[in-house]
């Protein structure tokens, strides 16, 4: 009924690694800080990494205050331009994010190579969504008890527009965990939860795509090709 909350239908929702900054290891931020303070590079990064806490009470913002040449950029294009404008300085792009931000990084690396920008490099900290799911499903609890206390997964919208729904099929087939890809809007999420609950109640383990208006099974093949050309 309209008066019932989602909590009455769905017992518990556990937030996954939705934010690339939240899953960024401190050691990677420490390395970026060392590059700026000790190597004297121009470190380019997205704004949401500047305040991430690092070791010894530092952050990129505080390292900048200590004299590090750390610059916020809005895209890899900005970082490339900084490298062009500073041919005598080493420019490092601190690349973070899931599959959504990986293709622009790949394009930047290819562009730098095409232009012969030998002073441009990337500190790659991109992460993969299917690998994160695999890590959860292969956690110590699985080895100890033979199960993981999760009934299913709500697949991410933005990432899935790039990788498609195909990569999730492995988890449904091999682990018997249903996956429903949800869109961005509240109604998208509510519908995805309903679809997920129906699968659980019916004993099904399939990949369903609630966000069919933007996500296909194969995803963005051009973006995938760029990533495959650059990254292992």
What are these regions (language model features)?
Residues 1-6, 10:
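Single conserved hydrophobic/aromatic residue that forms the stacking wall/gate
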Residues 9, 206-232:
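Active-site loops and adjacent core secondary-structure elements that bind or stabilize anionic groups
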Residues 11-53:
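Active-site cofactor/substrate anionic-group-binding motifs, chiefly glycine-
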Residues 85-95, 100-156:
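Active-site histidine-anchored catalytic micro-motif
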Residues 12-15, 67-76, 114-132, 151-154, ...:
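Short, acidic/small-residue loops that bind anionic groups at enzyme active sites
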Residues 49-85, 129:
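Glycine-rich oxoanion-binding loops at beta->alpha junctions
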Residues 1, 18-23, 48-52, 94-104, ...:
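Gly/Ser/Thr-rich loops at beta-strand to alpha-helix junctions
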């Amino acid at each position: 009924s309209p008066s019932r909350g989602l909590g009455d239908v769905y017992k518990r929702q556990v937030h996954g690694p939705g934010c690339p900054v939240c899953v960024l290891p401190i050691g990677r931020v420490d390395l970026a800080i060392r590059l700026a303070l000790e190597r004297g590079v121009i470190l380019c990064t997205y704004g949401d990494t500047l305040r991430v806490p690092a070791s010894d009470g530092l952050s990129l913002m505080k390292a900048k205050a200590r004299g590090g040449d750390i610059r916020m950029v809005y895209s890899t294009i900005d970082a490339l331009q900084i490298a062009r404008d500073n041919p005598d300085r080493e420019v490092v792009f601190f690349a973070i994010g899931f599959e959504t931000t990986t293709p622009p990084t790949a394009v930047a690396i290819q562009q730098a190579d095409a232009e012969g920008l030998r002073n441009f490099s990337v500190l790659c900290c991109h992460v993969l969504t299917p690998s994160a799911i695999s890590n959860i499903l292969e956690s110590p609890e699985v080895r100890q008890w033979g199960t993981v206390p999760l009934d299913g997964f709500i697949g991410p919208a933005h990432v899935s527009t790039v990788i498609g729904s195909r990569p999730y099929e492995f988890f449904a087939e091999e682990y018997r965990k249903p996956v429903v890809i949800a869109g961005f809007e509240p109604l998208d999420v509510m519908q995805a939860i309903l679809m997920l609950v129906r699968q659980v109640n019916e004993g099904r383990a399939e990949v369903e795509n609630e966000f069919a208006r933007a996500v296909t099974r194969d995803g963005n093949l051009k973006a995938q090709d760029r990533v495959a050309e650059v990254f292992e």
